[in-house]
Amino acid sequence: MSRIEAVFFDCDGTLVDSEVICSRAYVTMFQEFGITLDPEEVFKRFKGVKLYEIIDIVSLEHGVTLAKTEAEHVYRAEVARLFDSELEAIEGAGALLSAITAPMCVVSNGPNNKMQHSMGKLICCTTSRINCSAATIFSAGSQTRR
């Protein structure tokens, strides 16, 4: 059997229980622009989908054009507010991280600041040894598209 060289974790829904919170933030964001969505449907349809793709889909379905950067600002502010008050580590995540001896990192499609926020909450809720420096967080959202 080969030695494990590193362990990569997705953050949302794996280390922190953020997916329902993010769905609620989508609902709030769209309400700001006069679009009412069912939170449960948002969770089922858009779990793991990138923010701008969600904005495109909902805009098309509702026959509107939303300014993505303005909508993103509303969404990010609501996510930060909800994370501060409600975000919790997934049960057992801290113990799992503490038990792993291989190097670890966190990967995500979200922006680095969201991951820093999530990981900060995880560290506050656990005694894990994961290092939350920029070197251990890899964000596809921060990469430029070609």
Model-derived regions, located:
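Active-site neighborhood of HAD-like aspartate-dependent phosphohydrolases
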Residues: M1-K44
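Short, acidic loop-to-helix structural element flanking the phosphoryl-transfer center
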Residues: R3, R81-V106, N112-Q116
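Short beta->alpha linker loops
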Residues: I21, F46, K50, V74, ...
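Helix-loop "lid/cap" segments that line or gate small-molecule binding pockets
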Residues: M29-F30, K50-T65, S118
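Conserved H-loop
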Residues: T36, T65, C125-R129
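Metal-dependent phosphoesterase signature
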Residues: V58-A95
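Substrate-recognition "cap/lid" segment bordering the active-site pocket of phosphatases
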Residues: C105, P111-R146
